[in-house]
Amino acid sequence: MCIRDSIYHIDETAGRIIQASFCGVSDVCGTAHLPMIPGHTVSTFAIRFHAFGAYAFADDALRGTLNGFESPEVRFGRLDRALRARLPELRGLSARTAYAQSVLLAFQCRENPLVETAADALLYHRGTATVSEWAHELFISSRQLERLLGEYWGLSPKKGSALVRYQALYQEICHGTLTDVQDAVARYGFADQAHLCREFRRYHGENVSRFFKTSCENGRTMEENGVYPPEEAST
C-alpha cells in the first residue's frame, strides 16, 4: 500500500534487462506477472521505497503516480541509468543489492524537513487526524498541505490518511491488540461499522469480520515476514 517499487526483470541467459517499471502507491488490490522467455532464465530485482521517502531519490515531482505504472526513467532517470548499466552483469542477489545500495546512497539528495515532519505526524496519529488538524500541526494551511504531499508523495492528504489508517488497523488486528469491530470503529474514527467495512474491503479485498476471525494466523504470518507497526516504520 504505502510503498513504491522499482522493478527490473533480467534475462540471465542473454544478460539484459527485458522490462523495468516503477509502481506508485496503490490503493487497490492487484497481481503482477513475471515476463517469461522460453528457454531463458528470467529473474527479478526490485527496490522498495517507503512512500514517504521515495522523493529523496527522484528527479521530478511524484504528482500523478497514485496507482501508476511507468518506466523508472520518467521519475528516477539518474538512478535508472546507473542500475541498467550494471545490474545484468552482476551475478547473484547479494552483488546486485550491494551495488544498488551504493547507488542509492550516492544519489539521495532531496530533503525537505517539512515533508519528514508531515510523515511523522501522519504515522503518530495512525491516519486518524483530519486534514485541518494535520496541517495545523505543521503550521501551514490545508491547501499548502495538499500541494506539498501531491508533489513529494503523489498523494492527497485524505488518501494518505486513509491508507495509513487501514494499515494500522490491519496490523492491530494481526497482533491481537484489537479484537472487536466496534472498538475499531471508535479507535480509528470511522463513522460507523458500515464505514469501516467499506474501507477495509476497498483496500484488503476481504470482509473485516472474517479477517478478525483469522487474526491469529495473520499475526504469525506477519511475524515471519518481519512486518512492524506504523510507529516503528522509518520514513
What kind of region is each of these model predictions?
Residues D5-H9, R147, R198:
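A broad, structural surface signal
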Residues M1:
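Sequence context surrounding c-type heme c attachment/ligation sites in exported
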Residues A162:
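Short, conserved glycine- and acidic-residue-centered signature motifs
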Residues L149-L155, E199-S209:
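A secondary-structure capping/hinge motif
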Residues R4-A119, L123-S132, L138-S142, L155-S156, ...:
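Alpha-helical bundle regulatory/interaction domains
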